[in-house]
Amino acid sequence: MVLKTELCRFSGQKIYPGRGIRFIRSDSQVFLFLNSKCKRYFHNKLKPSKLCWTAMYRKQHKKDAAQEAVKRRRRATKKPYSRSIVGATLEVIQKKRAEKPEVRDAAREAALREIKERIKKTKDEKKAKKVEYASKQQKSQVKGNIPKSAAPKAAKMGGGGGRR
């Protein structure tokens, strides 16, 4: 017999039939929580990514590395197949594959050189505009007009976060 399990919207844990608390928001969105603890934390607007027992925290901090590796290994075993890609026929792809590495490297270097030149050109244009703008600003500025320094920021209030 297969049980239909659902996931808690806060903790990410499995909820078996007959368990959990269903919450329907005023915009008709349905939330299913594992227990009152998850529901309470959700309503208090606590972030599940900051609570070390939730699935989101564990995923962000790479705690379930062994399970992830198993999943990746399963996904990696795909059967090879030859099929043309949009914009390139199978013959073109095979021709590129059969191409010598020296020719491929030369083409890549040429493309990189062109891109670098384009970037350098745009940077030079930006510099020229910046210099032009700065010179206009200096001309328009009156001698007695000195910009005020920014007011110092007030210290932040509140706790430092930490574990809950």
Swiss-Prot record:
A GO molecular-function annotation: mRNA binding
Region span, Disordered: 117-164
GO cellular component: cytosolic large ribosomal subunit; endoplasmic reticulum
Biased composition (Basic and acidic residues): 117-133
Transmembrane segments: none
Entry keyword set: Ribonucleoprotein, Ribosomal protein
Pfam families: Ribosomal_L24e
SUPFAM superfamilies the record matches: Glucocorticoid receptor-like (DNA-binding domain)
Domain of life: Eukaryota
InterPro entries, alphabetized: L24e/L24_sf (IPR038630), Ribosomal_eL24 (IPR056366), Ribosomal_eL24-rel_N (IPR000988), Ribosomal_eL24_CS (IPR023442), TRASH_dom (IPR011017)
Entry similarity comment: Belongs to the eukaryotic ribosomal protein eL24 family.
Described purpose of this protein according to its UniProt entry: Might have an extraribosomal function in reinitiation of translation.
Subunit structure: Interacts with the cauliflower mosaic virus transactivator TAV to form a TAV/60S complex. Interacts with REIL1 AND REIL2.
UniProt-recorded name of the protein: Large ribosomal subunit protein eL24z
Originating species: Arabidopsis thaliana (Mouse-ear cress)
